[in-house]
């Protein structure tokens, strides 16, 4: 099962943090669920959450990069389901590399909630819907907020 080995993670107190959520519109039902759960988790943690939508996963990095300049953290959400061509690999690699580069270049946490699955059923199982085994939208938000808090602590003590 996919949850095996995951650390126990609690919703952090993110009061005062500003986080953006950028969500792709492809695979709308899945992405809308990821988006709702990420936004709900951010607000429940006390963060100020702003919301943005883009067409697809390839458009995520450029918008995330712009938002990383003005936010404590950014969450990128999308869903790429494998098809019959190599396009899946190109999209997944480009998005993952882009989001990682942005996080490193800006020192801003980027929660990567872009699902990369072989089937739509796998995406549904990870999107936090009824019967899901995981909730990658909320998990990406918690990871981004937690990392922003760690960076804030480091900057305050190393300052």
Swiss-Prot record:
Pfam families: DMRL_synthase. It catalyses: (2S)-2-hydroxy-3-oxobutyl phosphate + 5-amino-6-(D-ribitylamino)uracil = 6,7-dimethyl-8-(1-D-ribityl)lumazine + phosphate + 2 H2O + H(+). GO terms for cellular component: cytosol; riboflavin synthase complex. Pathway: Cofactor biosynthesis; riboflavin biosynthesis; riboflavin from 2-hydroxy-3-oxobutyl phosphate and 5-amino-6-(D-ribitylamino)uracil: step 1/2. Keywords: Riboflavin biosynthesis, Transferase. CDD domains: Lumazine_synthase-I (cd09209). Its EC number is 2.5.1.78. The active site is at 87 (proton donor). One of its GO terms (biological process) is riboflavin biosynthetic process. It comes from the Bacteria. Catalyzes the formation of 6,7-dimethyl-8-ribityllumazine by condensation of 5-amino-6-(D-ribitylamino)uracil with 3,4-dihydroxy-2-butanone 4-phosphate. This is the penultimate step in the biosynthesis of riboflavin. This is 6,7-dimethyl-8-ribityllumazine synthase. It comes from Corynebacterium glutamicum (strain ATCC 13032 / DSM 20300 / JCM 1318 / BCRC 11384 / CCUG 27702 / LMG 3730 / NBRC 12168 / NCIMB 10025 / NRRL B-2784 / 534). The lineage of its organism: Bacteria, Bacillati, Actinomycetota, Actinomycetes, Mycobacteriales.
């Amino acid at each position: 099962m996919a949850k095996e080995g995951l650390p126990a993670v609690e919703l952090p107190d993110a009061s005062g943090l500003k986080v953006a959520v950028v969500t792709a519109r492809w695979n709308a039902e899945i992405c809308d669920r990821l988006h709702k759960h990420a936004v709900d988790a951010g607000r429940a943690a006390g963060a100020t959450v702003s919301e943005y939508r883009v067409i697809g996963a390839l458009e995520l990095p450029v918008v995330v990069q712009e938002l990383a300049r003005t936010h404590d953290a950014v969450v990128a959400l999308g869903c790429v389901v494998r098809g019959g061509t190599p396009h899946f690999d190109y999209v997944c690699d480009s998005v993952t590399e882009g989001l990682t580069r942005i996080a490193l270049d800006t020192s801003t946490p980027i929660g990567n909630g872009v699902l990369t699955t072989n089937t739509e059923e796998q995406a549904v199982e990870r999107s936090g819907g009824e019967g899901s085994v995981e909730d990658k939208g909320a998990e990406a938000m918690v990871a981004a907020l937690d990392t922003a808090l760690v960076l804030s602590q480091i900057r305050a003590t190393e300052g």
